[in-house]
Structures are given as C-alpha cells and as structure tokens.
Amino acid sequence: MGNAVLISNKPKWCELIAIGQKKWELRKTKPKLKPPFKVYIYETKEKAFADIGIYGKTKDGVRYNFVHRIGKVIGEFICDEIREVYQCNSGWVAENACVMRREFFDYLGIPQDTHFGYDKKAYAWHITDLKIYDEPKELGEFYNLCPKGFNDETNYACYRERGLKLRFCKYSKNGKCDSKLKIPPQSWCYVEDLESVSR
C-alpha cells in the first residue's frame, strides 16, 4: 500500500475542485489509509471538453487553463475526513460535492423514481489544503506498488515475479517494490507520496 492516493476525475469535476466550489469528493470506496492523507488529482481525457478553450480562476485568483491539463495530474489536496453518505443525504451531496440528486442516485445504482436503496452508500472525501499545479505532472511521475514484489535484503533491490523468472524492477531507497503508473485508475489507487520518494 502506498502512503497517498491518486484519483481519476472528469474535467468538469476538476474545474469545480480547482475553483473551490467542490469541497467533497464522492467515491464508492475509501482507502485503508487513515486521514489525513494526500490525494493527487488526475484529470481524465474527454474530447468534447478538450475542444473548448476554457479558462477560469481558482479561489485564490490564479488563472487556470482547463484544456491543457487533461490527461495529467493537475494538483493535490489533503483528505482530512471521510464521511459515509446515503440516498437520504442527496441534499448535502448536491451542496458540498456538486452532484445533483439524479446523478447521485445513478452513481449509487438506484433506479429512477424509487425510494428504495437507502442501504447503498458512498464515501465523501473532504478536500482541504488544495494545491493546483502551475505545471501539471505526468502520470509516469507516480509510483504504484507491485503487488507481487519482494525485497532482496542483500542489496535492497526490488524484484517482480514474472513466471519462473525474477525480473529486475527498480531500486528503491526504502526497499519497497514499485513501478511507474502507465494508465490512470478507474476510480483511485494507492501511490507513493512524491515528497517522500527520492529517485
């Protein structure tokens, strides 16, 4: 498990986060990390959005070019609290996570025009200490731990199992087995905090 999280978000949600309107991030699951922990924001690629030249300002008045950030890690925040939210919390979700009632029900998989499904829940991750990068980061700058890795105690090299062969993966200062991210997560994944990794 890494010591931070990377989330994938559509451009419209990234824009709302960047301008300070979206204060809570909605997810179906939550990490095993205890708050507070760092969350990196990856902005997904959407052609329709990319064709529009949109500029805005963050809550600090910084000009934000939304188009040139797609397909990159645009910023980070600290998640200091996670709340469980249910169908009956749709008003709170609309106000704080900028997700309308119908969108929230669709996200939870609750059929339209139904009052059932109160047991279905999502998790609201609180967004604090938001930083939008002047220069977005590439996905390949982030490391995800290899699930089948183990440490060689003699030289602290890190290896990954490939069939019957052991293939050299990467040296790591702290002896952890890790690899660069190549594709963004569907929702989120564990990563190493860039500030704690010296490569």
List each language-model region with its residue ranges.
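Structured alpha/beta reader/binder surfaces that contact nucleic acids or chromatin modification marks
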Residues: M1-R199
